[in-house]
Amino acid sequence: TLHKLVDFDRINQGATRLSVGAVNVETGNMTWFDSDKTEIRADHIMASGALPPGFPAVEIDGAWFWDGGLVSNTPLQYVLDEQMPADDLCVFQVDLFSARGTVPSSVWTSEGRQKDIRFSSRTRFNTDMMRRLHKTREAARRLYAKLPPELKDDPDARALASGNADPRVTIAHLIYRQTRFENQNKDFEFSRRSMLDHWAAGRRDVERTLAHPDWAARHHTGERVNVFDLSA
């Protein structure tokens, strides 16, 4: 099916970079399949979405892989580490599991709620960590500029102030809000009705975000890192 729907030759031509993550079942380590470094094939895409227990592990070059969401469901850090230092970034970060929810009332709803927390918590953690890191780097550069000349040659001072200025990063955080009829099987329930509902919800959230006045004014803020959650 993927070969009918996806033009892998176009992906591997390099005009648009594609990176997908999967976790090695035997080592527990995250692996990145990056079109800038690897020829992307259908099995790479299948591995990146092989979330157990609904989907079996996928074998690639003798190793077995599951969905990378088991380690990092929104791998923002990989994008930031791989981008060019001077480039400003506009990131649309899609979170299919909401960190916010109600207290479970049964074993079944507990299963669904713990999936929400498990797969969404790293998203907010990574975003918050990135903002703190940007502020720390900027403070280090400002402090270095105030040092007297005899201290600017200190190796520790040069290390703190090294590198280019961090790029300006704008993140649109699109969070899926669960419907009332979903249950604990939502991570592997792919009926036609569910897919149509999910596609429609995604379109509404994107349109609502792009039309929001805060998004239109995003370039006027003084922060190097701006996170917008405007789809609620």
Feature map (PLM): residue ranges:
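Short alpha-helical scaffolding segments that buttress acidic/His motifs in well-ordered protein cores
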Residues: 20, 45-49
